[in-house]
Each structure stands twice: as structure tokens, then as C-alpha cells.
Amino acid sequence: MAPLSLNFKDDKKYKGLTTVWLLSALGNSIVKESNNYYSNKSNSTGNISSSTVKKKDIVNISIPKTCDEIQNFENDFSLRYISNLLYGVTICYNKKTEYVLNDLNHLLVQLQKNDVYAFKAKNKSTRINGLNSNNSIIGNKNNNYTWEECVFFDDDPLYDITKVPALEFLNTTLQDNVSFIEEAKSIRRQDYINELSNSNRFELHGDMTNSDAQSNLGSNVRNSFPLDEIPVDVDFNLDLDDIVSHQGTPLGSHSSSQKDGNDFKFNYQGDELVLNFENDNENNSNGGEDTSVENEGPVANLKDYELGLEAQASEEENDLQQKLNTRMQRGHRADVGGQFSKVQFDAKTSYPNEVLKFNHGNYSHLMEKNRIRKLTGQNFLTSNISSLVRSCGEEEFFSTNWLSIFNDFSNIKTSEWDLYPQGFSSVERGRKRAHSLVSTQSSSSTRSHEYGRKSFRNNKNDNYSSDMENDNLLLNLEQINEDLEDGHYIEENSQGNILDFNLNLPPSSFGRSHTRNSTRSSGFNEDIVGALRRRVGPSEQNFAEEDDSSNSCFSDGSQQNLQQDKTNFQDVILDYQTKKFYDYIKERSIVVGRTTRSNPPFKRKMLLVDIIPSRMGEAQTGANFDDVERGVSRQIAASAFLSLLNLATKGMVKLNEYPVADAVTKDLKLRREDEIIVYA
């Protein structure tokens, strides 16, 4: 690049070569367009990355002249420089092509916008003012104008919005096509039928053989029905020239409107309604008795329909008030549910326009009046639970049954409902049966021996059913006494606060025989109670010495315990392993235990060796010394004894020992398994 920058820096003839060389050096990404800079991410050095090539410079480059200049310097430059210049020419040609195509695309978009929004017909005589010669609103290429010229219509200065020229337009169209007159009349008659029947579905009327108009409608008309099946009497000779405004006054009149055939007549529920759209002036000129007699029927019918929603609502209110008065005289307060108003389907869809306009304009006033009437007539009713529970003649019976079902209301008197319909002091917490809804699967991928505050057993050596495990998933929450209405956990200074209950729960590690991540042998993976069940055997000891010693040592305490009540073990919170071990102790007490009455409330007694088998006695006597399955390991024995101490601390079991002859060594002597007595 040095030869170009030094020799041809100020020469205008070689300015194109400089731009081409810059494009080849910087690449195709750095171009300055409309003050937008595109930085080059290639490995460029120095200040080359900050250089830009303007769009104007690229457009001013002449590709043929640049190629001629490169050809003239072919002998002076090396092949490397020539190849770089040709690469720059390629980039320049690519950018110029993009610029040209973008400009053409922009011009095309502008032309399309002008063609759609600002196009005007070249020939003013081809503007559409109604129908063309072919009775077609939309023109075609056979005419002097194209489709684009037919998109917009010129405004008609003679158009009057108060007049509706639709009928004249249709008549002109039908007169030009005489063959379609009969079909048009049939279609118009069918439109009248559809309008009066207030429905657009005619699938139920399948019999079309007796229809006079079916033959004239052609094959394109479907879902029609015979005229005999019309629910109302219709005059099909009604003249559409009588256009009625929104105020109900006729704007125009035709000569045929003075005939009787222009009267709109129909029957509704046995009443004949006649609407005559005659001129008001002629009606006033024909005053007298004849006019009053002729209009007596229509006016009377119109007044009946003007009652509308207000008359119907008043009748319903009167009926409801009579029923309520009758029930109040009899002295019955029950059957309130039968007094609720039912939703009725209003089939009266043939109200005159005056009645409909009156109801629409005074809708809010009528609804407010109707609401006030209902509130005035039903102010003595109370919608509380007493009106739903009680029934006629059997108030106490039904109320007792309902209160037995809804146990939350058992401590509320029936007389208090009227004063405090929502002041219930008891709330069902719903935790007693929550254990049946909890999944037994752990969300962790690592096998866990703890679920919440429960340390559950290993599933490999489980002899219990899954129902027993489900009963203890949440630390036996059914044992937590939450009968708040009985006030077990409400203190004296709590003033009946239902949230003041016992939260003295044990920690999550309570009663666990081992930690979760501890390293243990394969033999310790089995359940402790399962290991004890397989290794226990009947004890050969007797309780001859214990009977005498227990009576002498605990005579005073036993007499005091006889006067005390039994311990309520249901209030004690146990984890799963401890409860399972306690059930195992109860089973062993039934099998090998002896009956005792010296330590109430415990009724059975046994030795510790009956619960936790040991190898100590086997080693001394020599019997079954090779049977290693008789005793248990030290880990299992220590864990079982720890659970036994926890039960003794909670008062679930009681531990005692044989008396020692030497009082000096009483506190220093270690007790054997057959010297510790367990009461359960």
C-alpha cells in the first residue's frame, strides 16, 4: 500500500485506485452510510479499523476506468498488489450493485403508494354514477377504464341522506331485467317471512312440496317452508314506500297507502294487533264517533302492550307478597329456599316500538324501582345458617344432625346464630388426616433416610405394610391434640387465641439411630427392630426375686401411683423408629412378659434380655455358642437401648433393677441384661 500512498496521493486520476485499495485492505464490512459506522472485526492493525469508506466515493468509482488503470500498471506492480486491487474492484462492484437495487426498490414502493392512494382517472367521462351499460357496478377491461379506476366513486352532490333510494334502485334494476321480477317478489316475500318469524333457522320445516313460492325461488334458495306454517298472519301487499323514522312518524305516503291492504296485521296469543300507517292529517279530519269506534280495538291493544315490563313486574311482586303474608300468618319460617324467584324465559318479543323505546329509555329507573320493591317485601328474611338448617316442625332434630356433621359448629348454640351468623370461634385446621395425602417418594436423587421430621425405615428389610408407613409420614400428627374447642393447648392468659397452640416439637434428628451420611457396614443397613425380631428368644430367667424386692423398694411409690390416672400416651410425640420400637416392646411383653400390678399404669414386665438378646449368657453357659445369630451387635444394642431410654423419659415404659446386697457397690456396679426390668 506504500507505493499508492506515496506516489499517487495527490493525483486525482488515481483516486479510484486508492479507494479500491482501501476496500481490499479493510474488507467489505467498513462502509460509512448515513453516519452509521460498521466496525471491522477482522485482525487489522494500527488505525486501519477506524477508517471508513463513504458511499459517495464508491458510487463515483468507474469500474472500466479502474480496470484500465490496473492494466496499465501491470508491469510496475507485483502480482500480490494486482490481486488486491482486483479484489477491491470486486467489492466495489458488489456495493454499487446493492446501492442501485436498493434505490430501485425504494422507487418501486413509492410508485405503488402513489398508484393506490393518489391515482386519478385519465378520462373524466368514465367516472361511475350508478350502473354502467352492462348493469354492472364494477367495470372490466372491456370498458374504457380499468379496475383501479373503479375503486373510488365520486361523491354525488344530489344525494340526500334523509331519503332512502334503495327501493327505486331495485325497481329500476328489476325493470331492466323483466325475467327476474317474479323471482325478486318471491325473495322479498321470503324476507318478510324470515323477519316476522324472528329466526333465521328453518331446518325443522322440511316439507316444501306445498309451497307456492318454492317453484319461483329456483335452486339457489334453501331452508324455506310453506306459507301455511307461518305462525302469524302477514299481509304481503305492504308498500315499502311508507318509510317510518325513528320517532314513528311517516315521512312519505304513496297513493296505495290509503288502502286497507297497507295495514300491518298479525295475531299474537289470540289478540289481533292492527297498525295502520295512515297520514295524521287524514286521521284528524275523520274525527268523530266513527274514528273512535274504528280505532278502539287497536288503541286498546296498544295500551295493553304499553304495560310492558312494569306491569309484569308488579304482578309478580303482588303474588310474592301474598305468599309471604300467608306464610307469616301461619308462623312458619322454614322453606325459605322455595321463595327464591326463578329465572323465566320471556317469550314476548312482539312489543310495539313505543313500548320497547319506553323500556329502553327508562331501564335504569325501572330496575331501581323493582329492586326497592323486592327489598321492601323481603326485609324480614335473614339468610343465615339457621334458616338453612331448620325445617318445619323438626327444628331441633335437623339442627342436631347438621351440627353433628359440621363439628366446627358443635360448641355454638342455636340461639346465637341470629346474632352472630359468621362469628365462629373454631376453625378446622385439617391436619389430622394430612398424612394420608403426602407422597412417600423423596424428591432428592440421593437416597435419604429422613422425610421432613421422620426417619423412615429401609425398604429392603421391611416386614410392615405400606399403610403403616403412610400413617407415620408426618411425625404422627394425628397424635398431636389439636381439638382447639376443648382448649387443651390454650393458656389462661391467651384469652382464647386459636393460634396459641403447642409448638414444642422435637428436632429432626430426634430418635435417629444413625446419621444420614455416616459410613456403616453392610450388616447395619437392616432395620433394628427387624434384627431384634429375628434374634430374640424366650428368657430363662424368673421374677421370683423381683417380686419381693419390688414390693419392698417401691411399696410407697406404688401406693401413690394407684391413686393417679393413667398416662395419656396419645399426647406423646414419637418419631417413626421409636414408635416402631415401642410396638415391638408391647408385642414382646405379651409373649414373654408377666402380669404385674405393683407399677400402674404398666401391666406387664419383662427383662431387658427379652427385648435385646445378648451373647453374655451364652458365653458363660456354653450353650449354643456357635449360633452367632442369637445375639445382636453392639451398634444395634446401643441404638435399641437409646430408644428405650427415650421411651422411659417420656413415661411410655419404666426401667427398674434388682436390689444389690452390698450398698457400697450399688452405684458402681454395672448391670447385666438380665438384671434390668422393663415395665410396659
Swiss-Prot record:
One of its GO terms (cellular component) is cohesin complex. GO terms for biological process: double-strand break repair; establishment of meiotic sister chromatid cohesion; meiotic DNA double-strand break formation; meiotic sister chromatid cohesion; protein localization to chromosome, centromeric region; reciprocal meiotic recombination; sister chromatid cohesion; synaptonemal complex assembly. Keywords: Centromere, Chromosome, Chromosome partition, Meiosis, Nucleus, Phosphoprotein. The keyword Membrane does not apply. The record marks R431, K432, R453, K454 as: Cleavage. Residues 278-297, 431-467, 540-560 are annotated as: Disordered. InterPro entries: Rad21/Rec8-like, Rad21_Rec8_N. Residues 278-290, 436-446 have a biased composition (Low complexity). Proteolytically cleaved by ESP1. One of its GO terms (molecular function) is chromatin binding. Residues 550-560 have a biased composition (Polar residues). Its main location: nucleus. Pfam families: Rad21_Rec8_N (PF04825). Belongs to the rad21 family. PANTHER family: MEIOTIC RECOMBINATION PROTEIN REC8, SCC1 / RAD21 FAMILY MEMBER. This is Meiotic recombination protein REC8. It comes from Saccharomyces cerevisiae (strain ATCC 204508 / S288c). The lineage of its organism: Eukaryota, Fungi, Dikarya, Ascomycota, Saccharomycotina.
